[in-house]
């Protein structure tokens, strides 16, 4: 009986030790990510980055995204709904992280469409046709024009602008900033410079709500 009690106590102690170690590890990961983001705050937002929402919003939501990323597509309407539910409170800043093969051409098309005042329309059109644009995680770039037709874009100008060194520089800078911030997957969110404690839309909503409440103090 005594040996059984000792065994149970030892097992309980081992379990508690494991749980404590896991919690400490998770907290350390979050602290390191926050310190990294704070130390590299200038890498979070660039003056050229596409933005949506109130320029003076108390919450700045930075999203590193890949237009060929399925999870990015799933999050896009959810983020817009969250912004609509908090009018004037959230400013969305999009940063490019074209990790899929050929996705840099989608980004170039978005930036070229932006020059014609059609960035958000082009983004939604490409996201809507994402399944037809990418096969086996590789973007079929020759299909881009088909799905941008009908937006009122000058496609000849768009194709020419896609080859612009300025657009190439935007992509290169965003990828460099993603590397600085150790972004390795998409979407990656920062709420007023803070990374999510763990990935998920509920976690994103909670952190945004927390920052909105702080702004009221």
Please name every model-derived segment.
Residues 42-59, 84:
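A short beta-strand-turn-helix
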Residues 46-50, 78-80, 175-177:
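A generic local structural motif
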Residues 50-52, 133, 196:
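Short clusters of hydrophobic/aromatic residues that line enzyme substrate/ligand-binding pockets
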Residues 1-24, 145-217:
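C-terminal cap of thioredoxin/glutaredoxin-like
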Residues 27-42:
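Ser/Thr/Pro/Gly-rich low-complexity linker/stalk segments immediately outside membranes or between
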Residues 57, 62-68, 73-149, 154, ...:
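Structural alpha/beta surface segment adjacent to cysteine/selenocysteine redox centers
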Residues 54, 63, 198:
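Conserved strand-loop elements at the edges of beta-sheets that form or border functional pockets
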Residues 43-44, 74, 170:
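Short secondary-structure boundary/capping elements
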